[in-house]
Amino acid sequence: MDIQTILEKTLPGLGYELVDFELTAQGTLRVFIDKEGGITVEDCATVSNHLSRVFMVEDIDYKNLEISSPGLDRPLKKAADFVRFAGQNAKIKTRLPIDGQKNFIGKIEGCENDTVTISFDGKTVQIGLDNIDKARLRPEFKF
């Protein structure tokens, strides 16, 4: 099995969502997890211990394993992410331009039929999930 398949099969059974992962050229495997209510250090330790054993059995080659929360500016990858974070601000970069524009910053209105709706400057734009190159939450800090 490949790393993504292992993570997608293992993490939900432990009560966590796979947000993203990366394997660096230096061999560091970074796994970003989330769950309702957020991630604690204990969660990271639990997942690290479990995945270390699974990767040993599956003979996955890596040097270091890092488990982390996705952070306040977490990536948005699936339709469920856009539904969950509706009402919050996001930055979306598209693969193909929409009305001559590829970068959008605005409020997520929702996601239906694999189409994300985002509003900004009094306009509303619909973006197909297949046209999204990168999307991240843009947290607001009020002082």
Swiss-Prot record:
Its main location: cytoplasm. Keywords: Cytoplasm, Ribosome biogenesis. Required for maturation of 30S ribosomal subunits. Pfam families: DUF150_C, RimP_N. It comes from the Bacteria. One of its GO terms (biological process) is ribosomal small subunit assembly. This is Ribosome maturation factor RimP. Signal peptide: none annotated. The keyword Cytoplasm applies. Belongs to the RimP family. InterPro entries: Ribosome_maturation_RimP (IPR003728), RimP_C (IPR028998), RimP_C_sf (IPR036847), RimP_N (IPR028989), RimP_N_sf (IPR035956). It comes from Neisseria meningitidis serogroup C (strain 053442). It is found in: Cytoplasm. One of its GO terms (cellular component) is cytosol.
